[in-house]
Amino acid sequence: MKIVYIYSSLALWGGVERILVDKMNCLVRHYGYDVYIITSDQGSHKSPYNLDDRVHLIDLDIRFHSRFRHNLLRRLIEYRRMSRLYHERLKKQLMQIRPDIVITTTFQDIRPLLKIKGDLPLVVESHLNFLHPDTLLHRIQLRINNYWAGRAEAIVTLTNGDAEDWRKVSHHVHVIPNMVHLNDTNLYSDCTSKRVLFVGRFEEQKNIGELISIWQQIHTKFPDWKLDLYGDGKLWEKYKCEADALNINIEIHKPTAQIMDAYRNSSVFVMTSLYEPFGLVIPEAMSCGLPVVSYDSPYGPAGIISDGEDGFLIPMHDRQAFGNRVCQLMGDEELRKEMGHRAIESSQRVYTDKIMPMWKKLFEQLTSLS
């Protein structure tokens, strides 16, 4: 079977990028699929994740990001020009490859793909929640996105909660959780270190500013504890400077390939995301024996964390409750260890060998109908 994924670039450290690489690697290694990924902005950058040599990476050399060098008017003109060029090159590649299935994770690709794909099944991977925007412009954009997404042969969501919303616009919605890198050693956190951990991209979605604000209150009660944040993104420098200026025992790190060591050397994992379709890092942390404190953001955390058993789910933006639960764990080593043990057991629900057969089944269903 010949599969084409479409994505902007694999050059960044990020959850979507890692998941795409993992899935493509699995499809070529275990199922013998012929897999391509077509990018618009990869350029000469290499992926920080190990992409199997059998996966064909084709970059269309568009460089959408370069338009931001111009003023607003010129930026709009450049975007239209680049979009036309992108669609022309994308159509040419699809005609040459002649895939069995096309998969996209970005909404702006759906409409042009529907026009150029012919009878090929189109799969839309939803790595963002079906959000309910609060501005007129966003509501209009959401309606447009939903209209075109609803015409795809399949929409794949990460959680049942997200799927319920998508079923308002499509009858072809499937739930397939993300693949997760779980701790596959016998080494776990003993929950005795005075370290709290966050891992994620430094962007608005992760709501890191609120986490830092919560930590200010925690630090007054537990000044000998440390908050470690690992990740990258456009807000990294901003939060690095903010954390350094506050001087409240926060250390901000760039991504590392040895992230499992960071999990095992910590005692509590925290997440304050505004929305989290799945939350890869939650089961990762749990598999290393960490209890998790997370906002109950739509829709991922509640599908992974059992509140009061292996972690705590906090109502959105209740900073006081969030801080109280973190302090509760910091002040009770036995509770940390008990919840950590249960977290290890809970993490086993998302093993990779349960996920990829679901994709294989979907692909076979779609190709049998085309």
Where in this protein do the model-derived segments appear?
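N-terminal strand-loop element at the rim of the active site
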Residues: Y5-W13, C26-I77, D165
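A conserved mid-protein helix/loop that constitutes part of the nucleotide-sugar donor-binding site
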Residues: G14-D22, K194, F198-T220, K234-E237, ...
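Donor nucleotide-sugar binding/catalytic pocket of nucleotide-sugar-dependent glycosyltransferases
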Residues: V124, N146, G150-T185
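Short alpha-helical donor nucleotide-sugar binding micro-motif in glycosyltransferases
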Residues: A149, P255-T256, A262-S266, W359
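Nucleotide-activated donor-binding/catalytic signature segment of Leloir-type glycosyltransferases, i.e.
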Residues: K240-P255
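Aromatic "clamp/platform" in nucleotide-sugar-dependent glycosyltransferases that forms part
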Residues: L274
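Short hydrophobic beta-strand element within catalytic cores of glycosyltransferases
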Residues: P291-Y295
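Conserved acidic donor-binding segment of nucleotide-sugar-dependent glycosyltransferases
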Residues: S306-G308, F312-Q320, Q328-E333
